[in-house]
Amino acid sequence: GFKWIANVMRENEGKARYLGGGEESYGFLAEDFVRDKDSVSAISLMAEIAAWAKDKGLNMTDMLIDIYMKYGFSREKGISLVRKGKSGAEEIIALMKQFRENPPKEIAGSPVVTVKDFQSLVETNVATGETKKLDMPATSNVLQYYTADRTKVSVRPSGTEPKIKFYIEVHDTLASADEYKATEARADEKINRIAKEFGITK
């Protein structure tokens, strides 16, 4: 969460320019004079963006599509599996062990090229077997798989609830605004396919 964003800010004070930091639960930190999630600054920025867009005859979705066309389309979905009780906790432990010891060789037809294990702080190049240490301030029970087509799947148990969480991120190109809906639908279909590959069923 934000304690780690603030930690990186402290380490880089006077060395680099801070642009912004956020987490998957929608918190955002826009300025470096606050060291925690800052809804006041974030909503002020959103209002300014909306006003700028309106002045140009656009809306915020139009602006997002322009970004996708320039930098590439990206879509992420978080899926949580609830596994309650003692048997549920044991199942979550077993799933993490299985994913750690037997990582997928491909995801949605694209070969896995990199595996990051934030518990051992080791990044593995799947093709060469070469490993390197991840530069992180602490360990965490998180696994990440990256494929050749830039798909990323992250897996971790919740620290506060009886859940195992999956974050699936896919990428595509967007040539024109007219293709946005079709690209979005294609990304959603791919995410659902990946979820099935990982055995994610409610």
Question: Model-derived features: where do they sit?
Answer:
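Short, well-ordered beta-strand elements
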Residues: 153-155, 164-170
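A generic beta-sheet turn/junction motif
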Residues: 159-161
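Phosphate-binding and adjacent anionic-ligand microenvironments
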Residues: 1-156, 174-180, 184-202
